[in-house]
Regions:
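Conserved FAD-binding catalytic core of PHBH/FMO-like flavoproteins
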Residues: 3-128
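Conserved mid-domain beta->alpha element of the FAD-binding
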Residues: 27, 114, 136-217
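Alpha-helix N-cap/helix-start capping motif
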Residues: 30-31, 182, 221, 239
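Phosphate-coordinating loops and pocket residues in cytosolic domains that bind phosphorylated ligands
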Residues: 38, 197, 208, 246-247
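A generic structural signal for secondary-structure junctions
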Residues: 41-44, 60, 95, 189, ...
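Short terminal targeting/anchoring segments
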Residues: 130-135
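A charged, well-structured terminal subsegment
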Residues: 218-228
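C-terminal auxiliary extensions adjacent to catalytic cores
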Residues: 229-252
Length: 252
């Protein structure tokens, strides 16, 4: 565990076992609760609970073979295949207002009654027959970054959730981490200094779309939902819209 960081001729890191290590470059990738980032920036963790809980599980022998997205009142879920053996992943984002004491209680998210309340919320609000089909169910509180904080220290790179944690409604967390890692490699290889400039632009694009998706997916007014569904059916077939909304994300 990192205890302290000094920027000398090289980057000197003091570890919890009292060992010291020196490096030319430091890549910080220890997640949304990054302690290393807090040490570098000399401030508390810049995160907040997103009033949402993620529910994950597995489904076997689901009738559809493609990726399925379902939108409901204050929740949405995705079902997608993971192999050719008709095994699927199930991921749902559910709006959930929790008290601080509940958020910090790790055991709550493994509690059978809590998990049952989450799954029942989905079962009761969708026509899709999922009851008894979802296995290995787990839940996690969702935390997002309050704001984007970068490092002015030399040869120091934040990446993944340690750099910025998005609302999970655009399926971009992992892919943005991979993309950022490639940019770090290029920056180091070419002795560049443009990593954060590129990341800031992309983070703004992804974050805006993530927040917009989250809002649209969780609409509850029946009239608004009716028109939302009609508009979405039109937009997903519109190449210009898809290029505008997705092209800037998937193409540098």
């Amino acid at each position: 565990e990192v205890k302290n960081i000094e920027y000398l001729a090289k980057i000197k890191i003091n570890l919890s076992n009292n060992q010291n290590e020196e490096f030319d470059y430091l890549v910080v990738a220890d997640g949304v609760f990054s302690k290393t980032k807090s040490i570098i920036l000399s401030e508390e963790k810049n995160i907040e609970f997103n009033n949402s809980v993620a529910l994950r599980g597995n489904i076997k022998n689901y009738e559809k073979e493609d990726i399925s997205l379902y939108l409901g009142k204050d929740f949405h879920f995705v079902i997608y295949p993971v192999n050719q053996n008709k095994e699927f992943n199930f991921i749902s984002i559910i709006k959930k207002n929790l008290k601080n004491v509940e958020i910090s209680d790790v055991s709550l998210f493994n509690d059978d009654n809590f998990l049952k309340s989450l799954t029942n919320e989905i079962y009761n609000k969708t026509s899709v027959q999922l009851e008894g089909k979802i296995e290995n169910i787990k839940s996690f509180p969702i935390f997002v970054s309050r704001s984007l904080k970068i490092s002015s220290k030399k040869n120091t790179y934040f990446v993944g959730d340690a750099l910025y944690a998005y609302p999970p409604s655009f399926a971009q967390g992992a892919s943005q981490s991979i993309e950022a890692s490639a940019e770090i490699f290029d920056d180091i290889k070419n002795n560049g200094n443009d990593y954060y400039n590129k990341r800031i632009k992309k983070i703004k694009l992804v974050n805006l779309r993530s927040k917009l998706n989250h809002f649209i997916f969780h609409l509850s007014n029946p009239i608004i939902v009716f028109f939302r569904n009609i508009i979405l059916k039109i937009l997903v077939k519109n190449k210009k819209f898809l290029e505008l909304y997705l092209g800037k994300i998937y193409r540098n």
